[in-house]
């Protein structure tokens, strides 16, 4: 079992937990024997001192049993929490190796649920294994053994009852197991809906769509509740059936033992001991039933957790080159084709981008602009064709090396909680001169300087304490601070006014050593680019200067005319 690899690291604490629980169970097995002795010798002979001695023995058994149980609980908690912590660390590390294709399959809400809820279920199973699965078998086998020592014939009643209960428990476990897998998947759906609602709460309110979203959420929670009720009904059969079998066995024992008491082959105390041992078996089986319920949930969680741990990045890091030196033909696409699942997005793209060149990319929605630049850092691998950077195939570079030389600013601004300085300096330690240049080029210097704490100003989660334009400028500053050889700006100036956008484009032109790729919906934002790439349904239909495209490229002409006519109407 794969989980044993984690438990082995804590085998010392787990073993001690097992041992102390067995010690407690052994003491518990002694109680019926002492009670039988009290009845037969103490009460039977009216020996008060013997009864008091036995009473002290029972108190001693109880105290030591309590202490052993406490030690077991401590070691069980230590082991289960340690295993859970290590699982979470390994999962988090593995998730951070995932590429975009992995995250398309294992969604963020599902990963969060697995990282938290599923690991908790495994922790509980580990703790219960140490605390209960050591005690219950020992108690049951020990009770059967002690019962055989008292009366071999009556003990057969114990054996038959235990077999019936074991078969019943196993059957109910097999029937209920699929329900827990479905319940965990439904929890993923609920988490996904909740996350979407929390992220898009303003949009939902703006369109008065709360009722629809509430219905969506209620539908999935009802489905989850229905599955819980179904499995609850199945498992509810277990305890009553267990009590029925055990109590029926006790009645038979009392009835059958009456004859043996009459003929003197069995004492009254031994009958009481047999009943107590039957009750011990009942307790052990109830514990088994509860543990099996926990194991059912943990099995589903175990599969989901190890799916995360065993899912390898689809983009394999098998490159050998650890350095990247810019050359004249900085980026080359050679007959590149790509698609998501069954949908083709890019078709037979071939082009070259020179070192230090500023290239714009424009096209309609779904043209493949963002997809194209995502291939540069191997967020996805191509279906066919090759991409070369600095004279080598991108697959031949170490992933860390390749990504170190490419800096992205994505459409959706992503700022983490902390300070402006911490957000911008994510790629390397703080250097004042590089920071000032990054803020100046990104047009963020003025508004950051006006903040009372400057670059030490706090950033709340998602950068919600800044406007959309300010967030975009900070993410551009972060990308510039990296000083990568290739800078990709993916429609990241949409929230900037025209004057700020124009100033940004002018400053970017001054970065002569950096190869820049700018995606935008505005032709005005791309006018200064050395060349502009025009995509139409994943095909390259134009790649030239702004002026030349206006003459030769129909798609670019239509985009330009539609934007300028709108601006003209607005100005008019």
Q: Model-found features: residue ranges?
A:
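ABC-type nucleotide-binding domain
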Residues: 324-572
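Juxtamembrane helix-loop junctions of ABC transporter transmembrane domains
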Residues: 19-20, 27-40, 61-108, 112, ...
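An intracellular "coupling" helix at the cytosolic face of ABC transporter transmembrane type-1 domains
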Residues: 9-11, 75-76, 97-101, 117-126, ...
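Transmembrane helix-loop-helix hairpins at lipid-water interfaces of multipass membrane proteins
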Residues: 8, 14-71, 75, 148-153, ...
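Helix-loop-helix
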Residues: 47-51, 60, 146-161, 167, ...
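Hydrophobic alpha-helical transmembrane segments of ABC transporter permease domains
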Residues: 19, 23, 27-31, 56, ...
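Pre-NBD coupling/linker segments of ABC/ABC-like ATPases
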Residues: 313-326
């Amino acid at each position: 079992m794969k989980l044993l690899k984690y438990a082995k690291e804590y085998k010392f604490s787990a073993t001690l937990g097992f041992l102390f629980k067995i010690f407690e169970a052994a003491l518990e097995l002694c109680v019926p024997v002492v009670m039988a002795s009290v009845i037969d010798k103490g009460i039977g002979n009216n020996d008060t001192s013997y009864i008091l001695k036995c009473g002290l023995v029972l108190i001693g058994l109880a105290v030591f049993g309590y202490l052993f149980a406490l030690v077991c609980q401590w070691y069980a908690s230590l082991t289960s929490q340690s295993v859970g912590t290590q699982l979470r660390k390994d999962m988090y590390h593995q998730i951070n190796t995932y590429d975009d294709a992995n995250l398309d399959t294992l969604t963020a809400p599902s990963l969060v649920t697995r990282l938290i809820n599923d690991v908790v279920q495994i922790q509980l199973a580990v703790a219960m294994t140490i605390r209960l699965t050591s005690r219950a078998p020992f108690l049951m086998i020990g009770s059967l053994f002690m019962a055989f020592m008292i009366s071999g014939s009556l003990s057969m009643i114990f054996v038959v009852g235990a077999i019936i209960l074991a078969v019943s428990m196993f059957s109910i476990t097999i029937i209920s197991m699929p329900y827990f897998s479905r319940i965990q998947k439904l929890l993923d759906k609920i988490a996904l809906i909740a996350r979407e609602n929390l992220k898009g709460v303003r949009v939902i309110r703006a369109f008065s769509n709360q009722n629809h979203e509430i219905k969506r959420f209620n539908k999935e929670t009802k489905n989850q509740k229905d599955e819980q009720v179904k499995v609850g009904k199945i498992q509810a059969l277990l305890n009553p059936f267990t009590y029925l079998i055990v109590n029926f066995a006790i009645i038979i024992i009392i009835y059958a033992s009456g004859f043996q008491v009459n003929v003197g082959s069995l004492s009254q105390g031994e009958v009481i001991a047999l009943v107590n041992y039957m009750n011990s078996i009942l307790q052990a089986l109830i514990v088994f039933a509860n543990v099996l319920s926990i194991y059912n949930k943990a099995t589903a969680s175990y599969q989901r957790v190890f799916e995360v741990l065993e899912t390898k990045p689809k983009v394999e890091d098998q490159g050998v080159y650890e350095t990247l030196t810019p050359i004249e033909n900085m980026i080359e696409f050679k007959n590149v084709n790509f698609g998501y699942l069954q949908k083709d997005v890019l078709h037979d793209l071939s082009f070259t981008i020179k070192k230090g060149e500023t290239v714009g990319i424009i096209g309609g929605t779904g043209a493949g602009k963002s997809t194209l630049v995502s291939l540069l850092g191997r967020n996805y691998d191509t279906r066919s064709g090759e991409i070369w950077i600095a004279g080598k195939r991108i697959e031949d570079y170490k992933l860390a090396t390749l990504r170190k030389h490419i800096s992205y600013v994505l459409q959706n601004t992503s700022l983490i909680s902390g300070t402006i300085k911490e957000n911008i300096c994510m790629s390397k330690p703080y250097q004042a001169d590089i920071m000032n240049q990054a803020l100046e080029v990104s047009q963020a210097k003025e508004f950051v300087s006006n903040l009372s704490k400057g670059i030490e100003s706090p950033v709340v989660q998602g950068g919600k304490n800044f406007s959309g334009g300010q967030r975009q400028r900070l993410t551009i500053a972060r990308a510039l601070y990296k000083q990568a050889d290739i800078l990709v700006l993916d429609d990241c100036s949409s929230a900037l006014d025209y004057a700020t956008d124009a100033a940004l484009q002018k400053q970017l032109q001054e970065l002569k050593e950096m190869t820049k790729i700018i995606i935008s919906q505005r032709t005005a934002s791309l006018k200064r680019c050395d060349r502009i790439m025009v995509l139409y349904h994943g095909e390259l239909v134009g790649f030239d200067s702004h002026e030349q495209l206006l003459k030769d490229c129909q798609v670019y002409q239509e985009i330009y005319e539609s934007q300028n006519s709108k601006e003209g109407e607005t100005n008019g």
